[in-house]
Every structure is written in structure tokens, then in C-alpha cells.
Amino acid sequence: MDDIYGIIPVSKFKECKTRLSPFLSEEERENLLKVMLKDVTDTLRKYTDKIIIISADEDVLNYAKSLNLSVLKENDNSNLNKALKQAMEYCKGKTKKVIIMPSDIPLIGKTNLKMVIDSSKQLDFIIIPSKGGGTNTIIMKPLAIRTKFGDFSYKEHVNAADRKNLNPQVHDSLFMALDVNTTEDLGEIIVHGENTETRRYLKELKINVESVHGSERLKVTRGS
């Protein structure tokens, strides 16, 4: 049996990151998701036995195959948590643990992911929060809890792990908490994302950032 598999659910490319419209076009948003997925999987593959991309989108699955990743076609009439259940059912009996994370945390390489994964060998449940009370990563045995990804899922996941006596351990990571949804998030990638495919792509789009004082800490603009 393998030690750990990565599970990454990916939504349809053409429906992704609508909050970045009109700052980025549909094609640019699709390309952004591709480079972010590459950044995430390039880091994750160093520390996992297999990475599984689950999606209902054939374009996503074909792109994942081009990155030499394993793929699962999401069942019909599914949603995020049902898709994760499907992926974990596939993993059960094949691997001791799974690490579940989104495709839009391109700064993952700046955290000590090896340390987190190594510690999971002695711990039953590790959770990494996202900004705003969500969850960006869970490491656990397949199907150890029923996932509740969505708004304010962090507390729900911790409570679910407590009910199963899994002694949940929280790992705070600035870089893994940053999932990309807004133009200010793009600015954070410009500031912190040196040596990432995502930052290189944003610079190709002539996206610039400057520090400001106010409710928005970063001013993000596009050059001509």
C-alpha cells in the first residue's frame, strides 16, 4: 500500500474564476488555472505517490494527462464534496492517507509541505485553513470524515474530526491560505510568487502591483 495520494478537484476551465472578470478575459482565466494547477502539482508530486485530478470537464482531464497526472471523471450530477467522496473511494485500500487541496494555491512551493506530509505519518488529521474561514488542505485516511467544503468549512471539518476522535492538528500557512479569487490575490502572487509559473504568466499579461494604504493593501493594474 502506498503512503499518500494527492486529490485535487478542478472545476470546468471555462467557468472558472468569474470574479476576475473583466480584469482577465475568459481565455486568460483558463490559462491562469492551468499554470496554477501546474505549480500545485509540480510541488505536490515531490512528496506523494500519485496525484489524482477529478473533474467533470474533459478539457481539464486532458490537460491533467498532459502533465502525467492520474485522472478521474466526476460522476454525473455531482458536486465538490461528492466528487471528493468518489475520489477517496477510489483511493481506499490503495493508500494510507490522502492530501486534498484545491488547484488555485500556486504559492504552495513556498511552504514546507514535506514537513507537513511527514508529520501526517504520526497524526490522523491535519488541516490547513484558507482565508475567510475555509479549508485549503486536509490530510487524513480516505473517507475518515465526510468533507464539507464550502463557506466556513474550517470549523465544520475540525468538528467532524473531533467527533471521530481524530485529534485534528491545525497547520497555519500564509502561502497555502492564499487561493486566487480576486485581483488583490493576483497582486500577492506578483509579490511572493517568484519562480512560479503563475507569476511568470501574470507578468506576461503585464500585470503590475503597488502597495497602497486603505481597505485594499495592493493596487493591481494592467499595462498596455
Curated annotation (Swiss-Prot):
<dbReference type="InterPro" id="IPR002835">
    <property type="entry name" value="CofC"/>
</dbReference>
<dbReference type="GO" id="GO:0052645">
    <property type="term" value="P:F420-0 metabolic process"/>
</dbReference>
<comment type="function">
    <text>Guanylyltransferase that catalyzes the activation of (2S)-2-phospholactate (2-PL) as (2S)-lactyl-2-diphospho-5'-guanosine, via the condensation of 2-PL with GTP. It is involved in the biosynthesis of coenzyme F420, a hydride carrier cofactor.</text>
</comment>
<dbReference type="InterPro" id="IPR029044">
    <property type="entry name" value="Nucleotide-diphossugar_trans"/>
</dbReference>
<keyword id="KW-0547">Nucleotide-binding</keyword>
<keyword id="KW-0548">Nucleotidyltransferase</keyword>
<comment type="similarity">
    <text>Belongs to the CofC family.</text>
</comment>
<keyword id="KW-0342">GTP-binding</keyword>
<dbReference type="GO" id="GO:0005525">
    <property type="term" value="F:GTP binding"/>
</dbReference>
<dbReference type="Pfam" id="PF01983">
    <property type="entry name" value="CofC"/>
</dbReference>
<dbReference type="GO" id="GO:0043814">
    <property type="term" value="F:phospholactate guanylyltransferase activity"/>
</dbReference>
<keyword id="KW-0808">Transferase</keyword>
<comment type="pathway">
    <text>Cofactor biosynthesis; coenzyme F420 biosynthesis.</text>
</comment>
<protein>
    <recommendedName>
        <fullName>2-phospho-L-lactate guanylyltransferase</fullName>
        <ecNumber>2.7.7.68</ecNumber>
    </recommendedName>
</protein>
<comment type="subunit">
    <text>Homodimer.</text>
</comment>
